[in-house]
Amino acid sequence: MKKVILSVSDKSGIVDFAKSLVGLDYELYSTGGTKRALDEAGVPVKSVSDLTQFDEIMDGRVKTLHPAVHGGILADRDKPEHLQQLKDKGIDLIDIVVVNLYPFKETVANPDVTEMDAIENIDIGGPTMLRAAAKNFKHVTTIVDPSDYDEVIEHIKNDSLDETFRKSLMIKVFEHTNDYDNAIVNFFKENKEPLRYGENPQQDAYFVRTSDAPNTIAGAKQLHGKQLSFNNIKDADATLALAKKFEEPAAVAVKHMNPCGVGVGSSIEEAFQNAYDADSQSIFGGIVAVNRPVTKELAEKLHSIFLEVVIAPSFTEEALEVLTKKKNIRLLEVEMTVDHDEKEYVSVSGGYLVQDKDTKTISRDDMKVVTKAEPTEEQWKAMELGWKVVPSVKSNAIILSNDHQTVGIGAGQMNRVGSAEIAIERAIEINDNVALVSDGFFPMDDTVELAAKAGIKAIIQPGGSIKDQDSIDMADKHGIAMVMTGVRHFKH
């Protein structure tokens, strides 16, 4: 019978996965909390101590660090001498290793974390098993990501758990352990950068880097300018996240954590001009991110206005010559790749919240036209642009957009109509090709009625209100095309 070791901190999906393995005639071995979870769910599982014939010691610090575990994982099954040594020592082969590590990043994200808390969340046995199994990917399947559970089961059922698939899992493992080790290094280097002050001058602050990945603000390469402030860092992070959403040339301007202008175009220069024209007043003193290299032509446009920070994947030498004439402007070089599995953390009194970042994307095929009127192609493009932007706007959020820029943004109001009124009032244009975009459903039809009075002919919103039909009827009354996505994008 083939053997599996399971030892996971993130227990999402582990019970169903374990049940599937048992159904496929695998014998399960586990440790600590994972074994308790499986026992409570009635899944047949043995203790790793049954393999090692050695009890856990030192409060669980030593559980799997044993030849009976690592011999069974590392044995090269193409070498008869390896198999003979296992037989001589009474060691069984291990075919699948399922491990994810102690939550070190989550632990050190707590501002009140102690060094001892951090130390106790440094995993030793987990990375050792992962690396051993990944090294032997020709013979052993290694799973570090719960999202791979279903695919692994399908491969087992289809007898396609081959070396190519195992190699793809191996790559994930080494990426994961590398990121894990970097987080530990960065924490214990005491990578706490004192800041001049926090959100306000009366607040002390510092910047703790838990990653130096080149696609993050923490890992950004600062090419010029003063030290980033607390508010610069927060705004820069929000600006970067939004710029990464676009594949076409795009420019994003942010003030106080809210976009004030977003533009796309056939060139990065055109995209920035569209973003600037979206709100040429609010961009003053803001932060701009572009997802293409900054050219001399773009640099001259940027140089003509006061900006705190410019973020880009790179700057040409000519662009730097222009921009560095301003002593204080911060220039950040950051990769524009997206990490879909990122977490975000929010401190609350007595603890902190952890959630996945809101990176869900949808296509037209996922959207539903609910009105008699169908959107035109121009309206579809306007809705798609606005739908990328609206998750970055404080709720309640209403955006007006065309196919190449935001034209009005209403953010952070306590009722949706209030945000719509602001977006309409500040709009640089309203015509048949402008769409109204809402981050949440309409509890009543008043926002649709307001849009109709303003001359808006296309709306996109999540839907899901018990009064959706009232909004649909109001849209039909005024010949408005309305699309529902089934996805909400609140931002607090």
UniProtKB/Swiss-Prot annotation:
Pfam families: AICARFT_IMPCHas, MGS. SMART domains: AICARFT_IMPCHas, MGS. CDD domains: IMPCH. Pathway: Purine metabolism; IMP biosynthesis via de novo pathway; 5-formamido-1-(5-phospho-D-ribosyl)imidazole-4-carboxamide from 5-amino-1-(5-phospho-D-ribosyl)imidazole-4-carboxamide (10-formyl THF route): step 1/1; Purine metabolism; IMP biosynthesis via de novo pathway; IMP from 5-formamido-1-(5-phospho-D-ribosyl)imidazole-4-carboxamide: step 1/1. InterPro entries: AICAR_Tfase_dup_dom_sf, Cytidine_deaminase-like, MGS-like_dom, MGS-like_dom_sf, PurH-like. Belongs to the PurH family. This is Bifunctional purine biosynthesis protein PurH. It comes from Staphylococcus carnosus (strain TM300). The gene is purH.
